[in-house]
Amino acid sequence: MAMHTNGPVFAGWDGSVIQAQQLQQQLAQRVLLHDEVSATPQLLAGFDVGFEDDGQSTRAAAVLLDAHTLLPLETHVARVPTSMPYVPGLLSFRELPALLQALALLSRTPDLVFIDGQGIAHPRRLGIAAHFGVVTGLPCIGIAKQRLAGSFAEPGPERGDHTPILLGGAQIGWALRSKPRCNPLIVSPGHRVSMQGALGWNLRTLRSYRLPEPTRLADRLASRRGKMPALAADTPLLF
């Protein structure tokens, strides 16, 4: 599959892996690791990405939630041609176009975004949640199911137990036991969220599942090829 570099997401990129890595290093310098989330957030959003047609189509699911009840208010699925093949460490270049399309479908701007993927817990400190945050300017957190970079001590067995993930002596995220007898999640800030804020928001949005509600609902939507989770009562369906 060829790499397609058209559009503002890839402005200035010649399609090479080396330049993509250089762009990641440059964009990582723009990541803000302090809390700029509203003191009284009203809307959260969860995003997840999947692929169809043998990888030729990228599918991004977006769920807008009430920040207080964690009930879904809107669900959307965006599909775009896949821009490049899978390259380890460059997932954001593959997923970002579809995520931006899904974001554009939301009728309201979320106060905080949760993305299924890495934030700064990435070899070059720019996973998909960090890349998305820098491009959109939205506060963003990454929640991944597997470690990509760094090392950590196994957290305790109880829900909420956590240990820092370290890379080169610096903390890049948390290993969070979100559910007993489940592997820990990899939680890291993406943009405009602190290390403690990323952990705190994940704990606040957990229910009885392994994933926090924003990415759990987005994962359901993405994995069911457009089938929507139940929306809050009296909420209009928006497409």
From Swiss-Prot:
NCBIfam families from the UniProt entry: PRK11617.1
Cofactor needs: Mg(2+)
Q: Which gene encodes it?
A: nfi
Source organism phylogeny: Bacteria, Pseudomonadati, Pseudomonadota, Gammaproteobacteria, Lysobacterales
Which reaction is recorded as catalysed by this protein? Answer: Endonucleolytic cleavage at apurinic or apyrimidinic sites to products with a 5'-phosphate
Please give one Gene Ontology molecular function term for this protein.
magnesium ion binding
| UniProt cross-references to InterPro entries, sorted A to Z | Endonuclease-V
Binding positions for Mg(2+) per the UniProt entry: 48, 116
Question: Record's family?
Answer: Belongs to the endonuclease V family.
Task: Give a Gene Ontology cellular component term annotated to this protein.
Answer: cytoplasm
Task: Please report the organism this UniProt entry assigns to the protein.
Answer: Xanthomonas oryzae pv. oryzae (strain MAFF 311018)
Q: List the protein's name.
A: Endonuclease V
> What does this chain do?
DNA repair enzyme involved in the repair of deaminated bases. Selectively cleaves double-stranded DNA at the second phosphodiester bond 3' to a deoxyinosine leaving behind the intact lesion on the nicked DNA.
Please state where this protein is localized: Cytoplasm
Q: Name one Pfam family in it.
A: Endonuclease_5
